[in-house]
Amino acid sequence: MADVVVGIQWGDEGKGKIVDRIAKDYDFVVRYQGGHNAGHTIVHKGVKHSLHLMPSGVLYPQCKNIISSAVVVSVKDLCEEISAFEDLENRLFISDRAHVILPYHAKKDAFKEKSQNIGTTKKGIGPCYEDKMARSGIRMGDLLDDKILEERLNAHFKAIEPFKEAYDLGEDYEKDLREYFKTYAPKICPFIKDTTSMLIEANQKGEKILLEGAQGTLLDIDLGTYPFVTSSNTTSASACVSTGLNPKAINEVIGITKAYSTRVGNGPFPSEDTTPMGDHLRTKGAEFGTTTKRPRRCGWLDLVALKYACALNGCTQLALMKLDVLDGISAVKVCVAYERKGERLEAFPSDLKDCTPIYQTFKGWEKSVGVRKSDDLEPNAREYIRFIEKEVGVKIRLISTSPEREDTIFL
């Protein structure tokens, strides 16, 4: 059976800590979408690990870690991550169906961002998915056969010829790209496998599989705050498509949310707080992007968005992250509905334009940092948690009270 860990905000919810905390109970940990535009930060024994492509199970020696087919892979960046770990043989597997991000994709991404101003990381993620959908991409499995790779490269060079000047690729692009693959392919190829068959077999044997999403539900290309979204499907349903596991294989869907809200880049954010309180949340919560180091926009918890995300993903339980960031705030707000042109909205609309938050205010608490038992939480903190559960209709089973792995309450 497989369990899914999925972000139910705009990403950066703390999925990495949760996966790291529970990975010891699983045989496989699988990253199922996105690219190196996402980042997980894990603190283990006082050491911070920033992962961008690697599944969060790499810190557990017994875990097999898979990068599955809907992930887009920068081979250069993945090689750099691999070099930071030892003994990954028979512990890391990359789907032969996963698509390769080329230097051209990053150039195209930067070019398009100048006019679109979506707020992308300019890592080439979107253009790589574009080539995938256009059936012109290069897959990881192509790196295993020099003849096939050469055919794919020649087709790529022909396709981009009209755009070389616009994307500033340079006269030596073809030679440089061939050298790029000569440098990195030998380091990556030993990890490339048919992970679809591997996971189907593991499921049939009853092995435990944890499926780890990147970004968050509200960035989903179809169901998020379009056009300010990522280029992949970020909901739990995409875990099946990427891995080859059928929907019957899914057991628990664990939705991850912070005790407040954040967003990176542009796009609507109804509960954003642009007063000094937003700055306080950013500073205390260390809200800066793992990948880009960009400051995150911060605000209050948005229950309209949270209920929507829980419904989309079929969440069976929630993990509430960074409760301690709200410590010491006398009045804690929660967005319970939107107002738009005089109308109260309790359902999440396809367009958040002109939506303003309707808040309910709770008395704050002094300290929750480092708490590991629910009985040790102050009454006001417990009331806040109960309200979220009641409104969303999903039980909170885990609460994080600091970045440390052990500072976690299980309910």
Residue ranges with predicted function:
Residues M1-L411:
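Non-transmembrane, aqueous-exposed alpha-helical and coiled segments at domain scale
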